Amino acid sequence: MAAARLCLSLLLLSTCVALLLQPLLGAQGAPLEPVYPGDNATPEQMAQYAADLRRYINMLTRPRYGKRHKEDTLAFSEWGSPHAAVPRELSPLDL
């Protein structure tokens, strides 16, 4: 019983530590917008802000491949075989 309680305590502790060590994210996993350093900022601070802002914009506008809804795409089995013969009507030249 003591071993089970110890394992449960370690699991709870490791879960709490893992949650606390996660990077700070905004709502629904979006990164936080960088804070403007002010009008009297040094050129180094402005360069760092510009780099952070560029990273922030790139993160928000990156393409998300493979994140489509199931209704928007057809299943491969619905396409049919690419080698299947397509029935066609006979033309007067075929007769």
Curated annotation (Swiss-Prot):
Residues 1-29 form the signal peptide. It comes from the Eukaryota. Pfam families: Hormone_3 (PF00159). Induction: Released in circulation upon food intake. Also up-regulated by exercise. The keyword Acetylation does not apply. One of its GO terms (biological process) is feeding behavior. It is found in: Secreted. The modification Tyrosine amide is found at residue 65. GO terms for molecular function: G protein-coupled receptor binding; hormone activity; neuropeptide hormone activity; neuropeptide Y receptor binding. One of its GO terms (cellular component) is extracellular space. Residues 89-95 form a propeptide. Keywords: Amidation, Cleavage on pair of basic residues, Hormone, Pharmaceutical, Secreted, Signal. PROSITE patterns: PANCREATIC_HORMONE_1 (PS00265), PANCREATIC_HORMONE_2 (PS50276). Belongs to the NPY family. This is Pancreatic polypeptide prohormone. It comes from Homo sapiens. The gene is PPY.
